From Swiss-Prot:
The lineage of its organism: Eukaryota, Fungi, Dikarya, Basidiomycota, Pucciniomycotina. It comes from Puccinia graminis f. sp. tritici (strain CRL 75-36-700-3 / race SCCL). The keyword Transferase does not apply. Coiled coil: none annotated. Pfam families: zf-U1 (PF06220). Its main location: nucleus. It is found in: Nucleus. Residues 57-190 are annotated as: Disordered. This is U1 small nuclear ribonucleoprotein C-1. Residues 109-124 have a biased composition (Low complexity). A zinc finger (Matrin-type) spans 4-36. GO terms for biological process: mRNA 5'-splice site recognition; spliceosomal snRNP assembly. Gene3D superfamilies: Classic Zinc Finger (3.30.160.60). PROSITE patterns: ZF_MATRIN. It comes from the Eukaryota.
Length: 190
């Protein structure tokens, strides 16, 4: 027996995976049951539920006891642990804004090193500018693009000579004619 129960349809789903729930929630019978449930409430009560759900979504609010569908849970949701949604995950005491949203925060010592300081970093100071040592950017190459390796295995120096057709220009067209012009420019062939 599945772990997800649909209050509108009075059924347990086979799996609790999001794809199964999504398929169920877009099904004809489920949509009919939801429509029937809200039509039985009356327009004013259904509209107040919709407005409250919208407000909670826009403000990122947590569980509300007044917003309950059939079975005691908000429509389309699963029962969660107590105080679920009331606050975010626990953050370490040295939380800062230099880490990305899905990255753990950096400890103060790392921030001090990144800011080029020996001691503590000043509050509100952002990350230092990124500096990378590397070869200069070749002409006609966008930043971040590496120069392609050549046939001889080295990435600097001239390209090896291209073999010419043996029969006076007859045969396959040159490499640049068979290649996208932008790509040929990136490779330095044009």
């Amino acid at each position: 027996m599945g772990k997800y129960y649909c209050d509108y349809c009075d059924v347990f789903l086979v799996s609790e995976s999001p794809s199964v729930r999504k398929a169920h929630n877009s099904g004809r019978n489920h949509l009919t049951n939801v429509r029937d449930y809200y039509s039985s409430l009356g327009h004013d009560k259904a509209q107040s539920y919709i407005d409250e759900i919208t407000r909670m979504f826009e403000t990122g609010g947590g569980n509300s006891t007044s917003n309950r569908g059939p079975g005691g849970n908000p429509p389309g949701s699963q029962p969660g642990p107590p105080n679920a949604g009331m606050s975010g995950p626990m953050r370490p005491p040295f939380s800062n804004s230099t880490a990305g949203p899905n990255m753990p925060p950096l400890p103060p010592a790392m921030l001090a090193l990144m800011n080029g300081q020996n001691g503590m970093s000043s509050p509100g100071s952002g990350p230092p500018p990124m500096r990378f040592a590397g070869p200069p950017i070749p002409n006609n190459m966008p930043p971040g693009m590496m120069q392609p390796p050549h046939v001889n295995g080295y990435s600097s120096g001239p390209l090896p000579p291209q073999p010419q057709p043996a029969s006076g220009g007859q045969g396959a067209p040159p490499l640049t004619a068979r290649m996208n012009p932008d790509r040929a420019r990136q490779l330095g062939l044009i």
